[in-house]
Amino acid sequence: MLDPVIKRALVSVSDKTGIVDFCRELASMDVEIFSTGGTLKLLQGAGIVAQSISTITGFPEIMDGRVKTLHPKIHGGLLAVRDNAEHQKAARENGIQFIDLVVVNLYPFEATIAKADVTFEEAIENIDIGGPSMLRSAAKNNESVTVVTDVADYATVLDEMRSNGGATTRATRLTLAAKVYALTSRYDTAIAAYMAKAAGVKGAGDTMTLKLEKELSMRYGENPHQSAGLYKMDDGNGVRSFSAIFEKLHGKELSYNNMLDIAAATGIIEEFRGEEPSVVIVKHTNPCGVAQAPTLCEAYRKAFSTDTQAPFGGIIAFNRPLDMETASAVNEIFTEILIAPAFEDGVLEMLMKKKDRRLVLQKQPLPKAGWEFKSTPFGMLVQERDSKTVAPEELKVVTKRQPTAEELADLMFAWKIVRHIKSNTILYVKNRQTFGVGAGQMSRVDSSKIARWKASEVALDLRGSVVASDAFFPFADGLLAAAEAGVTAVIQPGGSIRDNEVIEAADANNLAMVFTGMRHFKH
C-alpha cells in the first residue's frame, strides 16, 4: 500500500504551542482542517480556514464539551481500512469521510492534580475522554493515519509531507502510534492512582501500574557491559524526577553508580535537614563518615576523620550552603561528587578547576512518602519506604541506668544513620560523629569487629561512645564486644527471645540501653 496523502486533519489540543504555525503549513498544502472548542477559535482567529467538528458529525458539542468527538463519523473515518472494500462500502453508505491526520494532546490531568488546592470536581473535569479515544483509533490504523501527540513531532511530519508528496512514511506513522499508546497508558495510570487515593485505598493493592519516562540516558550501568538509564517515575504519589530535585552545575555526565550514591548520600543528609551543620561522606552507597558540628568545615573534618581512605573518589553531601573554608578543605582530596543546597560566592569557580569532579545543587528536599521497588528474576518486590522515625520520648529505657543527655543525643544521631547502612550494621558514634561503621556482614559480631577495627585504624578512641544496631542482638556477645570497646550506651530495636540476657549483660557493665521497637534492616 502506498503512503496515503494527507487530505483531511482533525486538530484538538490542550497545549497550543506551535499549533497555529503547524496548521498554517497544513493549510498551505491544501489539507482540510477540522477542529473543536478553543483550538478552533484560535485557528480561525489566526486566519486559518478551519471547520467545526460538528460539520462532520452533524451533532453539536454538548454537556459543557464533554461530548463532541465521540461519534461514528469520527471513529469510522479514523478506523476504516482504506483498501478494504467492505469498509469503503460502509463509509459511503454512512457518509463517512476518511481522516488522515489526527493532532491531539490531552487535558492536563497531571498538572491539575499537582495543584495544592485542586478539588475532586476540578480533577474529574480534566480527565480527557474523547482525546484518548481518537488517539487510540488513529494509532490502531497507523497504516493509513498519522497521529501526533507531541509538539516536538510537528516539524518531522511537515518535513516528510513536503518531501513525500503530502504523505508521511510508514516508519514515522508506526513510531508516532507507539508514542500514543505510551501516552494513554501513562495518562490512565495517573488517573487510576488519583482515584485510588481519593477512595482511601491503603497499601500496595492487588495491582499497581508504574508510569516510567526516560529522563537520562547513561553510558552504561553498574558495569560497562550493562545498559542503563534513569526514568522519571510516578507510583501514585507524584512524579519522582532527578531534574526536579537536583541540578548538575559542573562535570561530566552522571553515571548509574553516581545516581545510586547520590540517592544514598542525600537520603542520609535529609535526616539532618534544619539541624546544625552536617556532612555525609558516602562510598558505594554506604556512609564512611557522618558528623555534625558548629561549623560546616568542622563537621567535614570530623566526618573525614572517621575513615581517611574511603572518601577519595567518594560523594559528599552538605546540609548547608558550601562555604569557601569547607570547600578548600574538601579540595585537598579528589571527590567524585559534591552535593549542597547552595554554593557561596567564589566556591563554584574554585571547585570547577577540577574537571573530573561533579558539582550538584540540591534544589528541594527528597520526597519521603511512596513505595520502594526491587526487581527480581521472579517479579517485583514492593514495600513502603523506611521513613518512620522514633522520637526521644518514644524510646524505652530497659536498663537500670538512664542515658545521659549527651549519650541520648549521640544515640538519636546514630539511629538516624543506621537505617541507611547495609545490614548487618553496627555503628559507633561519639560527639555526633561516626567513629566506626560495620556494614553488610553476615554476622552481627563481625560487623562489630569491623567497626572497632576501622576506628582503631584512624586512632579514634571508642571509650565514651555509643553503639547502634539495626536489629536486635540475638545474643549478649555482640553487646559485650561493644562494652569491651568502651561503649557506654546502646540503641537497638529489641525483640529477641534473649532480650533479658542482653539487658542483664548491659546492667553488669553499667551500660544504658534503649529499645526503639523498630528494626531497620537494609538488604
From Swiss-Prot:
Alphabetical keyword list: Hydrolase, Multifunctional enzyme, Purine biosynthesis, Transferase
GO molecular function: IMP cyclohydrolase activity; phosphoribosylaminoimidazolecarboxamide formyltransferase activity
Residues of the MGS-like domain: 1-149
Similarity annotation: Belongs to the PurH family.
Hydrolase listed as a keyword: yes
HAMAP family found in the cross-reference section: PurH (MF_00139)
One of the GO BP terms on file: 'de novo' IMP biosynthetic process
Assigned EC number: 2.1.2.3, 3.5.4.10
GO cellular component terms given for this protein: cytosol
Gene3D superfamilies from the UniProt entry: 3.40.140.20, Methylglyoxal synthase-like domain
The gene coding this protein: purH
Entry's free-text remark on domains: The IMP cyclohydrolase activity resides in the N-terminal region.
This protein's name: Bifunctional purine biosynthesis protein PurH
Pathway noted in the entry: Purine metabolism; IMP biosynthesis via de novo pathway; 5-formamido-1-(5-phospho-D-ribosyl)imidazole-4-carboxamide from 5-amino-1-(5-phospho-D-ribosyl)imidazole-4-carboxamide (10-formyl THF route): step 1/1; Purine metabolism; IMP biosynthesis via de novo pathway; IMP from 5-formamido-1-(5-phospho-D-ribosyl)imidazole-4-carboxamide: step 1/1
